[in-house]
């Protein structure tokens, strides 16, 4: 998102003030993570240790970044703040006023014109989408998501944008089913395996809906999770420890280093169709309760 020179300078001052506030709130280091080759004015900010990350999702997840910068151990506390929220904090101390304005992405296959919008945190969804959702055929529906498709929350059209959401997504509702769909070649269905012939077109774009294409299945070892979780842990064993409620094993397998969003991509590709993010959250909650 391009900013004018004057707006960029103002934003830089807000970020610098936010970093100064963070330094006063912690005896530890303040780390600033940005996308490689798109640092902009970030290297000019003082008081924070700069880190760059490149690659596909989940490279941008804060949990992944913490894992590679300074892994969390038992007894340690790490606080994180989004870059736009850092600017809001800086704006508060620079100007003495609470201004919750931020920029969000409005995206998804059912959006007429994908764009960035300047909104106030918690804005009404219909005020953001107004006239920007593609017309639907009779019987078709859309799902509105506060956040992204992997970790966001379903919200009605008259609902509100989540406080922490920086994206509003609209995709087709998967409420249509196929008879014996599993037996069809399905050239237009996405799959990470070679279950469908769509693997012959690796660069093809898909309009994915919310259909899970099946129900929950036995939790089997596939080796898929390790391909989609760039962390030095054993995700399958950690999940099983969470299911068993074995806190000692959870600690040894890295429960302190993860949050549920780190496993979102694993949940998407999981052939067992298990709610992996919920398993991780339940494990974390159990650990906190028993601490």
Regions found by a protein language model. Give the residues of each.
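Gly/Ser/Thr/Ala-enriched C-terminal appendages of enzymes
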Residues: 148-291
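Gly/Ser/Thr-rich active-site loops/lids in small-molecule metabolic enzymes
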Residues: 15
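Single conserved hydrophobic/aromatic residue that forms the stacking wall/gate
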Residues: 2-7, 11
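Hydrophobic alpha-helical positions that pack around
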Residues: 25-138, 142-183, 189-192, 196-198
């Amino acid at each position: 998102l391009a900013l004018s020179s004057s707006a960029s300078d103002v934003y830089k001052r807000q970020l610098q003030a936010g970093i100064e506030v963070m330094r006063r709130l912690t005896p530890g280091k303040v780390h600033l993570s940005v996308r490689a080759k798109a640092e902009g004015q970030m290297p000019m900010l003082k008081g924070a240790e700069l880190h760059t990350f490149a690659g596909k999702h989940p490279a941008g997840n804060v949990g992944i970044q913490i894992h590679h910068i300074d892994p969390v151990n038992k007894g340690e506390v790490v606080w994180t703040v989004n870059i736009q929220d850092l600017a809001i904090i800086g704006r508060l101390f620079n100007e003495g006023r609470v201004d919750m304005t931020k920029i969000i992405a409005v995206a998804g296959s059912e959006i007429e014109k994908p764009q960035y919008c300047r909104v106030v945190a918690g804005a009404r969804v219909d005020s953001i989408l107004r006239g920007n959702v593609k017309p639907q055929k009779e019987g078709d529906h859309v799902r509105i998501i506060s956040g992204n498709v992997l970790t966001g929350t379903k919200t009605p059209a008259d609902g509100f944008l989540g406080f922490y959401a920086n994206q509003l997504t609209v995709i087709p509702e998967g409420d249509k089913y196929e008879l014996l769909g599993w037996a069809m070649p399905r050239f237009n269905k996405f799959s990470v395996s070679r279950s469908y012939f769509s693997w012959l077109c690796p660069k093809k774009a898909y309009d994915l809906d919310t259909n899970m294409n099946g129900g929950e299945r036995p939790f089997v070892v596939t080796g898929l999770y390790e391909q989609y979780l760039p962390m030095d842990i054993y995700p399958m064993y950690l999940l099983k420890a969470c299911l068993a409620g074995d806190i000692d094993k959870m600690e040894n397998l890295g429960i302190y280093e993860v949050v549920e969003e780190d496993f979102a991509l694993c949940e998407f590709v999981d052939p067992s169709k298990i709610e992996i993010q919920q398993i991780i959250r339940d494990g974390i909650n159990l650990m906190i309760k028993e601490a």
